[in-house]
Amino acid sequence: MCSTCANVLKYYDWDPHIKLVINPNKFLHVGFCDNPLMCCYPELLPEFGTMWDCDQSPLQVYLESILGDDEWSSTHEAIDPVVPPMHWDEAGKIFQPHPGVLMHHLICKVAEGWDPNLPLFRLEADDGSITTPEQGTMVGGVIAEPNAQMSTAADMATGKSVDSEWEAFFSFHTSVNWSTSETQGKILFKQSLGPLLNPYLTHLAKLYVAWSGSVDVRFSISGSGVFGGKLAAIVVPPGIDPVQSTSMLQYPHVLFDARQVEPVIFSIPDLRSTLYHLMSDTDTTSLVIMVYNDLINPYANDSNSSGCIVTVETKPGPDFKFHLLKPPGSMLTHGSIPSDLIPKSSSLWIGNRFWSDITDFVIRPFVFQANRHFDFNQETAGWSTPRFRPITITISVKESAKLGIGVATDYIVPGIPDGWPDTTIPGELVPVGDYAITNGTNNDITTAAQYDAATEIRNNTNFRGMYICGSLQRAWGDKKISNTAFITTGTVDGAKLIPSNTIDQTKIAVFQDTHANKHVQTSDDTLALLGYTGIGEEAIGADRDRVVRISVLPERGARGGNHPIFHKNSIKLGYVIRSIDVFNSQILHTSRQLSLNHYLLSPDSFAVYRIIDSNGSWFDIGIDNDGFSFVGVSSIGKLEFPLTASYMGIQLAKIRLASNIRSVMTKL
């Protein structure tokens, strides 16, 4: 105890030398913790029971403890007993309790004797230069105030965290759209208590293992005063999953009006049965903002909806603390915060299906992809690593054959080359000849003007739908230069190629002149994916039946009013100097991060990123636990690149993602 604390206690006639008397009989039915620095659930673990009679001599106690130890029976090495160095009141026995149990009872004793009447101290500037503006209207009475004794006990158990000025002001957390189309019972905001609520807490959480305490949340409504409507702020206890129903109003709640001029502040209390939460603990108190009365704008018409924006800001509560310091680089077993899944600048965004730059987002009813798509469990249903490099195979053919089956030399799934493309051909083909591209009148297309003017493009090429690869083809004794290779997934039947949307080692189809003669020639082939022969087709990856999978094709549809999206880029076409769109389920950086790191995200939530274009338009992208991306608008429109991305936090998946892009509305 420091001298300052001792003087304060003496001033109030307290003896700073605290005397603790513990009855060891209270230890008899208390379980012990096998990880005393981490666990706080002693009642769930096996009981301890090592004890000795006080009537025995010290030597007898010593020998009994050694002979009763499990290690003695196997190693015959003496282990000295550990007896707590303190006086035991009413002691009929000497115990050897686990340190975690001992600390548990010591902390409880301290907490029981804590005086709630001790004064509070406040540090202020002596010249009045530091002032605090009115930050909002505090709404109380929602639930019981935080337990100061538990907070103090947690401090004594684990050490107090650092104080700083960031604790005093509100920081932006997210913004939520509230439109006139939202009906009563619609959840606009749901957030579980934890460090992810505040950017400073999120940053400092990297230094600690555990936390405890409340968080203050401030809501500001951007309405112009002509709106009517009310929102309900509901405190939901741990273990309850919020539902979009007015039955949620049976929980403690308060109301605030859309015409509220001043910000409204709520406190999310920390309701817990333990001294602190680990960073993996997501089953905490939740704050839910629900539509109580529909939003009304008398100046809106029936052809479109209008709304306002609810801005959410947070700061740690007075009892918020971090516990159990750790090195910032060490990884927690439960996962880290998904704040680095999208690079800040769009100049670093390339697709996970093809390596060109992302140029747009495409909203589809369903999004699907297996290859190079990773989820939050670091798993993929595909066969490729999240990187682009040349494909390496060997191919053996004879008698001048050009169609053969490749054998993988670099793979993560046996028999399937790492990086092999994931779409198949549109129908049966006999690969031979040259390009055959005509318009609707069967006239050859030979110029850009003819291609752009054609109302119909007919692709009669006998190797259409295959990928074009630059090739380094080598075989002993073969002095000829390498030829372009055309590859796909399909079944080779003689000279015929049959499409297949499932892949295995027998379907690595390669169409290439490897200069084989009468005898079998085995070539070492290094292939770089450059283009595509599917002239006139829809975007690559848009047709579910042509997307290749090993067995399962991961797929997602709309969730909670949010629509799944593809990330669009393009690949160059063969013959015509044009490109074709490619649909990617993820940005390659996202795939790479998900494959390398274990992130913390529950199945009912999104990791939310705000995308802002060069004109200031913005929308939120939510990435779910399966790695798919969603937006809250039905149409994004043209964006002005470059774009920037910033991490916004975790949001419930059933809540529509925010944006300032107005969807196109049609009156029927």
Curated annotation (Swiss-Prot):
Keyword vocabulary terms for this entry: Capsid protein, Disulfide bond, Host cytoplasm, T=3 icosahedral capsid protein, Virion
GO CC annotation: host cell cytoplasm; T=3 icosahedral viral capsid
Cleavage, annotated site positions: E124, A125
Residue stretches spanning the membrane: none
InterPro entries: Calicivirus_coat, Rhv-like, Viral_coat
Pfam family, one: Calici_coat
UniProt entry tagged with the keyword Disulfide bond: yes
Gene3D superfamilies xrefs: 2.60.120.20
Disulfide cross-links: none
This protein's record includes keyword Disulfide bond: yes
Swiss-Prot/TrEMBL site (Interaction with host receptor F11R/JAM-1) positions: N459, N462
Other information: Mostly expressed from a sgRNA. Expression from the g-RNA is low and occurs at a downstream start codon generating a smaller, truncated LC-VP1 (tLC-VP1) protein.
Job description of the protein: Capsid protein self assembles to form an icosahedral capsid with a T=3 symmetry, about 38 nm in diameter, and consisting of 180 capsid proteins. A smaller form of capsid with a diameter of 23 nm might be capsid proteins assembled as icosahedron with T=1 symmetry. The capsid encapsulates the genomic RNA and is decorated with VP2 proteins. Attaches virion to target cells by binding to feline junctional adhesion molecule A (F11R) and/or to alpha-2,6-linked sialic acid. Once attached, the virion is endocytosed.
Assembly and oligomerization: Homodimer. Homomultimer. Interacts with the minor capsid protein VP2. May bind to VP3 and Vpg proteins. Binds to alpha-2,6-linked sialic acid at surface of target cells. Interacts with host F11R/JAM-1/JAM-A; this interaction allows viral binding and entry into the host cell.
Similarity-based family: Belongs to the caliciviridae capsid protein family.
Listed name of the protein: Capsid protein VP1
Highest classification ranks of the organism: Viruses, Riboviria, Orthornavirae, Pisuviricota, Pisoniviricetes
